[in-house]
A protein has these predicted regions:
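Conserved acidic carboxylate
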Residues: 11-12, 91
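Hydrophobic/aromatic residues located in beta-strands of well-ordered beta-sheets
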Residues: 37, 86-87
């Protein structure tokens, strides 16, 4: 049996995205799961392919930026449908991360455009925590 964790990444900065992907590749090597990724780079894609698609409802993790180069916001994602416990907010603007918190998001990593590698490390660490078999084992014991 193949174990898969599905991750939705909403990020339009391709350099940041490449850093996150490089770190997720390392995470995948340390886990019993394959990582299945869906990457969207504009807010209209979120509306068309996620919010309005009844089949797009099974993500384990959502990595969520806020701003989109098209002038919209990735916060158009239907948080309630997917569950705020699955979301990692990664805006470089503290106010935008606070917006996500007000909607129930608990995991926030301030994007640091000066220290991109360190930022990507933090994202990968949070993903690792969220998919860790030990975490799943602990949840089942409660």
């Amino acid at each position: 049996m193949i174990l898969i964790k599905k991750i939705l990444i909403l990020e339009d900065n391709l350099l940041i995205l490449s850093k996150i992907l490089a770190k997720l590749e390392i995470v995948e090597q340390d886990q019993p799961y394959l990582l299945s990724l869906v990457i969207l780079t504009d807010f209209q894609q979120v509306e068309d392919y996620i919010n309005n698609n009844p089949k797009a409802n099974n993500f384990d993790i959502i990595i969520l930026d806020r701003d989109c180069k098209l002038g919209g916001s990735f916060h158009n994602l239907n948080f309630e449908r997917f569950g705020t416990d699955k979301v990692i907010s990664i805006s470089a603007v503290p106010e935008y991360n606070n917006e996500a918190k007000k909607r129930g998001v608990k995991r926030v990593i301030l994007k640091d455009l000066k220290y991109k590698d360190e930022f990507a490390d933090k994202v990968a660490t949070e993903v690792r925590r969220m998919i860790s078999p030990q975490r799943l084992f602990n949840l089942k014991l409660r």
